[in-house]
């Protein structure tokens, strides 16, 4: 199985690590923006050294209470980082739901659009469908980032999320997008209770029946804090544990902050697999 993207046909014959890059601008001044972009690009280089297979660059935080970032601010934060990252030799994903940002980063050579709204914003589907080859990750989110936890989902969570993702993929395919360009993300932490998030993990293998690769994003999520009592900056170990559990249950890609630790843990996991080679 391969994931077709703008510049790469990404083999999914082993678990891949997607490293998170924060490109939120510190200020609108040129100096502040340049300094932030330089730090983000240095972080990209470090993540690649640590073993990241894919970079995921985002200019807007989806956490509740995070300051709003408008279109101009997001473009100012993301574009300089994408411009530099596309020459680093690995696929570049951009975490955005704005069609204007999607179009701009694809014009710069970005490979993947990673959208928490699953292309539900007006014009977003058309941007992806009109591109000849970009990859896309469609995520499930209940409601929106500001209200998703005020009234979480109820009922059969696995069935609802599966149905949403399948319908989203089918809608995109109906616009001419080939299925091998699509990856699905159940959306851990986006409008679900702690119990529901872990239910998605426990039943994650059921999503594989729909025929699309899966991305799992457990890194530093509040559900990990709920079961460990650890603050967000102390959640590296549970994040790695969740990534391993997700891979064990069939996830093809794990989206993480702690790339080096996740890669090391996956090396141990891989060594224990049947017919594993112990030499990297």
What are these regions (language model features)?
Residues 17-18, 55:
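Hydrophobic beta-strand anchors of alpha/beta hydrolase catalytic cores
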Residues 42-58:
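Catalytic domains of carbohydrate-active enzymes, especially glycoside hydrolases
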Residues 178-181:
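Short acidic capping loops at alpha-helix termini that bridge into adjacent secondary structure
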Residues 12, 29-43, 62-81, 87-91, ...:
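Active-site-adjacent loop and "lid" segments of alpha/beta metabolic enzymes
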Residues 25:
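Catalytic-pocket segment enriched in acidic/His residues
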């Amino acid at each position: 199985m391969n994931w077709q993207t703008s510049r790469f046909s990404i083999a999914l014959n082993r678990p891949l690590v997607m490293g998170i890059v924060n490109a939120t601008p510190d200020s609108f001044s040129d100096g502040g923006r340049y300094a932030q972009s330089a730090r983000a690009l240095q972080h990209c280089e470090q993540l690649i050294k640590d073993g990241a297979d894919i970079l995921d660059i985002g200019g807007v935080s989806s956490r509740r209470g995070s300051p709003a970032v408008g279109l101009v601010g997001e473009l100012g934060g993301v574009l300089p980082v994408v411009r530099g990252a596309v020459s680093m030799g690995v696929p570049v994903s951009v975490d955005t739901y704005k069609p204007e940002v999607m179009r701009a980063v694809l014009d710069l050579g970005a490979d993947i659009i990673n959208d928490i709204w699953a292309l539900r914003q007006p014009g977003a589907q058309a941007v992806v469908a009109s591109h000849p080859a970009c990859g896309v990750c469609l995520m499930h989110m209940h409601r929106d980032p500001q209200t998703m936890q005020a009234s979480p989902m109820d009922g059969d969570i696995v069935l609802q999320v599966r149905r949403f993702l399948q319908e989203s993929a089918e809608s995109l395919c109906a616009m001419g997008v080939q299925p091998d360009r699509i990856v699905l993300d159940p959306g851990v932490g986006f409008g679900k209770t702690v119990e529901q998030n872990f239910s998605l993990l426990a039943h994650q293998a059921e999503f594989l029946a729909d025929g699309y690769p899966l991305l799992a994003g457990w890194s530093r999520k509040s559900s990990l804090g709920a079961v460990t009592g650890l603050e967000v900056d102390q959640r590296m170990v549970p994040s790695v544990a969740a990534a391993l559990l997700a891979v064990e249950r069939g996830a093809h890609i794990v989206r993480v902050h702690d790339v080096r630790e996740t890669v090391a843990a996956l090396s141990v996991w891989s060594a224990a697999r049947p017919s594993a080679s112990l030499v990297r």
